[in-house]
Amino acid sequence: MTLDTLIGGDCRQVLQTLPDGCVDCCVTSPPYNIGLDYGTADDRKSDDDYLAFTRDYLAECYRVLKDDGRFCLNIGYKVSTVKEAGIDYVELLNLINSIGYTLRETIIWVKSKRPDDPQSFCGSNTAWGSWMSAANPICRARMEFIFVLNKNSFKKHHRGISTMTRQEFMDCASTVWYFPAERSRLHKAPFPVDLPYRCIQFYTYQGDVVLDPFIGSGTTAVACVRTGRRYIGIEQNPDYIRMAEGRIQQEKQQLKNRQVC
């Protein structure tokens, strides 16, 4: 199995080529099924098709995880007048349990720079529903979930090298995380590097293997390079793979420059 690699293709098929129990941690944010144009993937499936799609990749990730593996799954909070927009998180949790995962933590990612500044909210959801009227008001989703799952063992079977600072540990050891969302003209739904960085620092050791089946523009791989982890990324869109490769090389060069200094 090749590490530190990006693989092109549908993750449901690519994952089948990986051996059982080869990954220490999965960190990903799957398509939310809200109609975004990713270039090669259908982001407007029927409810049944989206649930089947979700079941397929979650089951394959479960298989490739080690017995003590963790899965950090970033998923949006479904707030929409359109039934097909996204997957209800209750349905998702039921599906997760049926596959065999155990829910370890539910982290709330608040898309703000800090808790005392609600105006710093930075996100893509601009729907208010009926403006200043009781006709059909809609609450804006200022948060998303990060479901932290275990395969079997809650405790790691081996001791490794932790690389987080004391402050990083304190920031991660909370069920509410504050940092802004990412914006990009090149990718429809990027997530900020803070998200995989925190998950990787908190739940893995140096040298562990991290899988992202929806690597997109490479954010999880960048976080792996930054923290000294190995990565496997899967992505359907060849343009995103090229973008990710560029970001990874840039991160490696910056790391090399810091080591020289």
Feature roles, as predicted:
Residues 1-234, 238-243:
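Core catalytic lobe of class I
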Residues 1, 245-260:
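Short, conserved SAM-binding/catalytic segment
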Residues 240, 260-261:
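Charged C-terminal helix
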